[in-house]
Amino acid sequence: GSPACLEPCRAKPIGLAVPVRSKFIRRSIVMNQNFTVRKLARCAVVAALYVVLCMALQPFSYGAVQVRVAEALCLLPVFGAEYIVGVVLGCFLANLLGSTIVDVIFGTLATLLACVVTYKLRNVRFKGLAIVPSLPPVLFNAVIIGIEIAVMFPDPSSSAPLWLACITNGISVGIGELISCTVLGVLLVKIVETNTSLRKVFLEA
């Protein structure tokens, strides 16, 4: 062939590739938008649920002796990083509405650290149960909130030294977290993992 017939031959596939590539880009943008919307919706629902549980069970959700049922949601990061935002936001709002500014700061910090480490341990299972991922909320809250209560809200009737008050409060908070996270939270994860409908709600991208 002559050079004259080669030029249109080269131009043809280029012209065909443009609409195909554009269609692929448009589809990718739509998929990413849907993915983002789902994540935002999950964050909003989890945050709202956390606040509602704390407000509805307020006598048990605050103080040195507490079983904050909403803390079971701290196990949700095993299903995805987006749940970290939802749980932390919920904790922040719940503390803002029902506790002091000190608890807003340190309580939210404890929940943030706990959720991040829980996410890192999301694939660890003990006999099929998410027991190991449930431990970070217990430990972080026991240490941080235990110290917070001992330092910022000391018992005026107690003559115990500060270090003992920290340990005592830490144990009290830790027991509550064990009930909320290692019992209720692990149960929540197991129910979601074994239920097809719930898996679609919590895990579908």
How should these model regions be labeled?
Residues 40-44, 82, 86, 103, ...:
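Small-residue packing motifs within transmembrane alpha-helices
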Residues 31-85:
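Hydrophobic transmembrane alpha-helices
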Residues 1-30:
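Short, Lys/Arg-enriched N-terminal segments with co-localized hydrophobic residues
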Residues 77-87, 123-130:
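Membrane-helix interface "capping/anchor" motifs
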